[in-house]
Amino acid sequence: YDNFDDGKIDKKYEFKNHPGKWVEKGGVISQTEPKPGDHTYLVMAGDFDEPHTSIVQIRVDEWGDGDLARCGLGFRLDPADASGYAFLIHHFLTNMEFLNDHLAWKQNDTKPPFGVIKTGEWYWMKAEISDKKFTGKIWPDGEKEPKKWLLESKLDFGGLRPASGQVGLNGGSSAALPAKTVVSFDNWAICEKASECDPDVILAVEATSKLSTTWGKIKTSY
């Protein structure tokens, strides 16, 4: 778990395949280069057993429509170049989709249930991976988490990637305008079960700066 409150990027994080320009300031971490290159991940190389779930608060700060405009969560990231499965805001701020990096899109373009992702506003993104399927959802900060996953799929697009235990924050892929992505993240956690990745629990942890046994295990497992 990381609430990014100390203003220092954890030395355990890795930046692949392109480094981007990550800045931790004001209690958030941001990828501030609008054209960081395809692809740009902050990676937590944690050897997390599957299934596992990742949750994060996300805020799109700048956006230009285009195929390489994207941001979100990555799983089974390759230790060499961080290619993996991703749950992304993609192309437009009205579209969510699954990607197998550089191999194939799932082609499951889906509009968020609330319509459009607005720049400058916070949302929660949550996704889970197992050997059977990949799932993801997004909802506005301050609203109740939807019970159902927005996207669900078998790992059947672009060829099967091996489990790596590595997860990451996708900070964009654009190499040229008009596509661009500047994005911020906060309150990032990886959990053994989807039910443990609960915003109320995470925000309570942030408020008290005290980790329960479960969170302590997560914190020390990478």
Predicted feature residues:
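Flexible glycan-contacting loops in extracellular carbohydrate-active proteins
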Residues: 147-183
